[in-house]
C-alpha cells in the first residue's frame, strides 16, 4: 500500500519507532482512523503535527474502562477529543429509535465500536485516566450540545455537554483556530483554567467570573420546564452565531454558568489551502484491512472538499450551528493540485466523485453586507422564501475550476454528488454552468433537496417554494435532452417535519404522482440537538414568532406520512387508503393505490369480518373462523424485532460511560437513506 506519508502513531510501539518517549497530545476520535481531510480526527492531528507537536491518534478506544486511554502513556499537554463525523446517537439508532447493526465509519461497517454519546464517554474516561490533564472536547457531537438541549432519544432536556462530560473546554465549529491557539498556550505552561478568551470555545464558570458583556438566555432548569423559555433561548443562540454580529452568550446550567465566546473566524482561503495540503495518506489505517476496511472511505477517497459553511439556512440542518452560514472556499490552484495528486494513486480509475462541500455550488459569501454587518438574524434566509436582492449569484469561478480539473491527464470524469442548491442555480441569469453541469458532471443522477412541496411545511423548513424546484426540474430535463443524455433527478424528501400535517403529506403524494416520481427510500424527520427544527419539534413553537406549530409525534401519524411518500407500493395500500380517508381525499385512491393493493386491502377486510380474534394476556392471539369447526391457530402478537413483551431497548441504556452496551443489535437495520430514484413515466 503506497502513501504520501506515514500514519501518525496509534500505539506505544509506533511512538518508539519514531524515537519518542512521550507524546505532546493525544487526539481521540469516535471513528476508525482514516487519514483523510473528510475526517475531523485526521485534520486536527495533522494540524497539530504541522505545528511541531508529537501527536498520537486513539481511534475508537475501548470504553469499558480507561485503560486504553493510557496506551501511549501520559501525554505532556493533554487530550483533544471528538465523537466522530456523525453524531453517535444518529449512528446507533434509526429515527424510530431502533438500534442499527451497521456503522460505515467503523471497521467492516459493523456497529458497536463506540459507545452511545461517545464524546461524553471518551471525555470522562480521559479524565479518569489522567485527572490533572486538560481535555478539549470538539467535533459535531459536542458543538450541537454546547447549550442545554432537547435529547430526542431520552425525550428530555439535558444540560450542556460541558457539564455532562467534564471537559475543560468545548471547541465548537470546525476547530482549527481554536486547536492551534489552545495547544500553543498549554505548551507555554498556561493553566487550562485561564484559557477562557479563545473565540469558538465554551467553558463553565461561576457567577463571579462571568465576562463583563454578554447576552443571557434562560438556564437549563428553566428551559427544561418551560417550552416558551426554550424557544426564546433557541432564538438567542441562533442570532449570536455570527463572527461579526454575535455576542458572548451565557446560560446557567445545574450549578455553574456556560459561557460561549463568539464564533471563531472562518479560515481564509490561504488557511484552507494549507489545511487541505497537509500530508494525509487519504486511506484508512492498515490495521483495518483484515476487518474489511472502513466503508466510509469509498465515497470520499476520490472526492475534493472545495468550500465550508452554507447560507442556505435550512432549519433542520446542523451546518449553520457548526460550520456557520458564512461560506469560505479554497483556491483553484489548491483544488487542482489535490486532483492531480489523486491521479497518481494506485486505486484511481479516472473518476473524481465530487468537488463540493455542504453546498457544492457556493464559492463566496452571500453578499457584501454580511462582511460588514454580519448575517441577517431573526430567521431571515438568503434564499427562502425568495432570493434576497442583495445576494451575489456567480458560478463562473466554480466553473473554471471544474474545467481545469476535467483537463488533467488521467481524469476521465468529474462528478458533483454533494448537494446542488437549485434555487441559487436558478437565480443565475447566465446558464453556462447549468449547461456544463448537465453535460459533464452528472453521473446519471443528480441529488437535489426540495424536501417537500406543501407551502406551510416548506416555510417551517426554511426552503423555497416548490415552484422554484419545478422550474429547475423542467430545465434540467430540457438541457439533458439537448445534450443527448438520459439523466434523472434524485430528490431528497422528508416526512413529518414540524408543520407537516397529514393533509400536507397527501398533497406531497399527489405531487409525486403527477410528476411521475417514485421514491424508493424515504426519510422521516430526525430531531438532532441544536437545530431550529428540533426546537419546534420539542416545544411546538416557532422560536422566531412563538406561534404554535403542528408536530406529528405519534407512531401512527409518522407511519402514515412516511408511507404516503411510497404510495405506489402495494404493501402500503392499507395505510395510504386510511390517510386518504382521514383527509377526505378518497378521490385519490384509484390514482395513488395500485389495483393489487386495493384488492389486498379488500380481502383483508373480508377476512377480518369473517373471523373472531382473541388476544391473550401472554401476548398471543387466537384466530377462529366464524361459522366453521376447524382448529384455532395461536400466534405471537409481538411485532417482529421486539421482545415478547413488545418493548424496545432504551437508547439510554448505553449512556453509562464505564459499562459495556446493555444490548447489541441483532438484525441488519437500515439507516435512513437520503437517496431516491426518480423515473419519468412512459406515455
What are these regions (language model features)?
Residues 14, 40, 59-253, 260-261:
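Glycine-rich beta-alpha loop elements in corrinoid/cobalamin-binding modules
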Residues 27, 43, 62-63, 341-490, ...:
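Conserved SAM/AdoMet-binding glycine-rich loop
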Residues 64, 193-241, 255, 264-267, ...:
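Terminal amphipathic helices with adjacent charged low-complexity linkers/tails
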Amino acid at each position: 500500500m503506497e502513501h504520501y506519508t506515514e500514519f501518525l502513531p496509534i500505539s506505544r510501539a509506533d511512538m518508539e519507532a519514531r524515537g519518542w518517549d512521550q507524546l505532546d497530545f493525544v487526539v481521540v476520535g469516535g471513528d476508525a482512523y482514516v487519514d483523510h481531510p473528510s475526517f475531523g480526527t485526521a485534520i486536527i492531528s495533522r494540524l497539530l503535527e504541522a505545528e511541531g507537536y508529537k501527536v498520537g491518534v486513539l481511534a475508537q478506544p475501548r470504553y469499558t474502562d480507561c485503560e486504553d486511554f493510557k496506551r501511549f502513556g501520559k501525554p505532556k499537554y493533554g487530550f483533544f477529543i471528538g465523537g466522530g463525523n456523525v453524531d453517535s446517537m444518529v449512528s446507533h439508532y434509526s429515527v424510530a429509535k431502533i438500534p442499527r447493526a451497521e456503522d460505515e465509519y467503523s471497521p467492516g461497517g459493523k456497529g458497536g465500536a463506540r459507545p452511545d454519546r461517545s464524546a461524553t464517554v471518551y471525555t470522562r474516561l480521559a479524565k479518569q485516566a489522567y485527572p490533572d490533564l486538560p481535555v478539549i472536547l470538539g467535533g459535531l457531537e459536542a458543538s450541537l450540545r454546547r447549550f442545554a438541549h432537547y435529547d430526542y432519544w431520552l425525550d428530555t432536556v439535558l444540560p450542556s455537554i460541558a457539564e455532562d462530560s467534564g471537559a475543560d473546554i468545548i471547541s465548537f465549529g470546525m476547530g482549527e483556530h481554536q486547536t492551534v491557539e489552545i495547544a500553543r498556550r498549554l505548551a507555554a505552561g498556561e493553566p487550562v483554567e485561564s484559557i477562557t478568551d479563545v473565540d469558538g470555545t465554551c467553558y463553565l464558570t461561576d457567577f463571579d467570573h462571568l465576562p463583563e458583556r454578554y447576552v443571557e438566555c434562560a438556564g437549563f432548569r428553566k428551559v427544561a420546564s418551560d417550552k416558551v423559555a426554550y424557544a426564546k433561548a433557541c432564538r438567542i443562540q441562533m442570532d449570536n452565531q455570527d463572527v461579526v454580529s454575535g455576542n458572548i452568550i451565557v446560560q446557567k446550567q445545574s450549578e455553574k454558568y456556560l459561557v460561549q465566546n463568539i464564533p471563531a473566524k472562518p479560515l481564509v482561503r490561504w488557511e484552507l489551502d494549507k489545511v487541505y495540503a497537509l500530508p494525509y495518506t487519504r486511506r484508512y489505517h492498515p490495521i483495518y484491512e483484515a476487518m474489511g476496511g472502513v466503508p466510509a472511505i469509498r465515497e470520499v477517497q476520490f472526492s475534493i472538499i472545495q468550500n465550508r459553511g452554507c447560507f442556505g439556512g435550512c432549519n433542520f440542518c446542523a451546518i449553520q450551528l457548526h460550520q456557520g452560514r458564512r461560506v469560505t472556499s479554497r483556491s483553484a490552484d489548491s483544488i487542482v493540485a489535490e486532483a492531480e495528486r489523486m491521479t497518481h494513486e494506485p486505486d484511481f480509475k479516472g473518476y473524481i466523485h465530487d468537488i463540493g462541500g455542504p453546498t457544492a455550488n457556493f464559492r463566496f459569501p452571500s453578499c457584501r453586507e454580511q462582511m460588514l454587518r454580519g448575517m441577517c438574524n431573526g430567521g431571515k434566509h438568503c434564499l427562502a422564501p425568495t432570493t434576497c436582492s442583495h445576494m451575489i449569484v456567480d458560478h463562473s469561478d466554480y466553473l473554471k475550476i471544474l474545467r481545469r480539473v476535467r483537463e488533467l491527464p488521467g481524469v476521465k470524469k468529474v462528478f458533483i454528488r454533494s448537494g446542488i442548491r437549485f434555487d441559487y442555480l436558478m437565480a443565475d441569469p447566465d446558464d453556462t454552468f447549468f449547461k456544463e453541469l448537465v453535460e459533464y458532471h452528472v453521473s446519471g443522477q443528480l441529488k437535489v433537496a426540495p424536501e417537500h412541496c406543501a407551502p406551510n411545511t416548506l416555510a417551517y423548513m426554511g426552503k423555497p417554494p416548490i415552484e422554484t424546484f419545478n422550474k429547475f426540474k423542467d430545465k434540467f430535463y430540457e438541457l439533458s435532452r439537448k445534450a443527448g443524455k438520459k439523466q434523472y433527478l434524485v430528490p431528497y424528501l422528508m416526512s413529518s417535519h414540524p408543520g407537516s400535517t397529514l393533509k400536507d403529506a397527501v398533497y406531497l403524494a399527489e405531487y409525486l404522482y403527477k410528476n411521475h416520481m417514485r421514491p424508493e427510500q424515504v426519510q422521516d424527520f430526525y430531531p438532532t440537538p441544536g437545530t431550529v427544527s428540533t426546537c419546534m419539534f420539542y416545544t411546538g413553537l416557532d422560536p422566531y414568532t412563538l406561534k404554535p406549530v403542528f408536530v406529528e409525534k405519534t407512531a401512527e401519524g409518522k407511519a402514515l406520512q412516511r408511507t404516503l411518500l411510497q404510495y405506489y407500493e402495494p404493501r402500503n395500500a392499507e395505510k395510504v387508503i386510511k390517510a386518504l380517508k382521514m383527509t377526505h381525499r378518497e378521490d385519490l385512491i384509484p390514482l395513488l393505490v395500485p389495483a393489487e393493493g386495493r384488492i389486498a386491502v379488500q380481502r383483508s377486510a373480508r377476512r377480518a369480518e369473517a373471523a373472531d380474534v382473541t388476544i391473550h394476556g401472554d401476548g398471543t392471539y387466537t384466530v377462529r373462523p366464524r361459522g366453521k369447526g376447524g382448529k384455532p391457530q395461536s400466534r405471537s402478537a409481538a411485532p417482529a424485532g421486539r421482545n415478547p413483551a413488545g418493548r424496545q431497548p432504551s437508547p439510554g441504556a448505553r449512556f453509562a460511560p464505564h459499562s459495556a452496551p446493555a444490548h447489541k443489535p441483532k438484525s441488519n437495520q437500515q439507516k435512513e437513506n437520503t437517496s431516491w430514484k426518480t423515473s419519468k413515466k412512459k406515455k
